[in-house]
Amino acid sequence: KLTEFKDDYLRLTNHWSFNDYIGFEVGLVSHQRKAVVESFYKLFNYPSKYVSVAPAVALELLPWGKKGSIFKIDYEKGWKNLLGSNIDYERVEADAQTIFQASRRQSYSIRLGAGFYTRKGDHWDFVDYTNFHDDNIPGGWNDSWSGEFELLPSQWYNASDYYIRGNFTYEAPMIATAWLPLIGKYIEAERLYVSSLVVNHLHPYTEWGYGVTTRAITLGIFAAFKNTKFNGIGCRFGFELFRDW
């Protein structure tokens, strides 16, 4: 626990939709990270609290309206000494998300994005990238795991001065498990997940996953690879009982 921090996150945003095709955001983003064991940092004359306060603007483009793809560009600039901030930085991120319906029950979910710092002051690695918090797709993804990295700790990308990402999900009523006797009749949808990320020290990080949805639950299993080497496996679980409420 010596190197752990408690993170208080605040984001205030005002969003304008000029029409169905263009949106604009202005807001303020703040992180306050406080060391769990403050005495450890004071012993070495390091700050035990890191605060960032950044005005942020974003432009959204929806070329085919609110039921289609969305492209978003985010810009943040953190000012040192603004409302107690001790971190200054400047960052740009771009994100594109879409769901392509091949048929009524078959779809492809795609997310592509990149981000980088144009200015890095002291302690800049105590700031989070925006597009690993937000999902911009109108109406949301078809499930909780599309467009995300399930097994990767956030410090890998937040401590990098750049990232390039891609997330892909294929959904269909019958891929593998639905063909099996006895249990196949309970499967409503199956999904294949492929995600990739390039950051400092990971060239690349990839996740491969498979998920099934029944009327009651959703189950997923994911395998992670760091620089092409197997890094672990994990499972995810979700309830579907109240999906249609």
Could you tell me what each predicted segment is?
Residues 12-16, 28, 57-61, 94-98, ...:
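Residues on the lipid-exposed face of transmembrane beta-strands in outer-membrane beta-barrel proteins
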Residues 1-104, 191-193:
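Transmembrane beta-strand segments of outer-membrane beta-barrel domains in Gram-negative
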Residues 4-10, 47-55, 86-92, 106, ...:
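Residues that define the transmembrane beta-barrel architecture of outer-membrane proteins
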Residues 20-26, 34, 62-69, 102-108, ...:
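Repeated loop/turn-to-beta-strand initiation elements of outer-membrane beta-barrel proteins
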Residues 1, 64-177:
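C-terminal outer-membrane beta-barrel translocator/porin domains of Gram-negative envelope proteins
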Residues 1-17, 31-46, 110-153, 221-245:
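Outer-membrane beta-barrel translocator/channel fold
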Residues 18-24, 66-71, 90, 104-110, ...:
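Outer-envelope beta-barrel architecture signal
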Residues 178-187:
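Short helix/loop segment immediately N-terminal to the Walker
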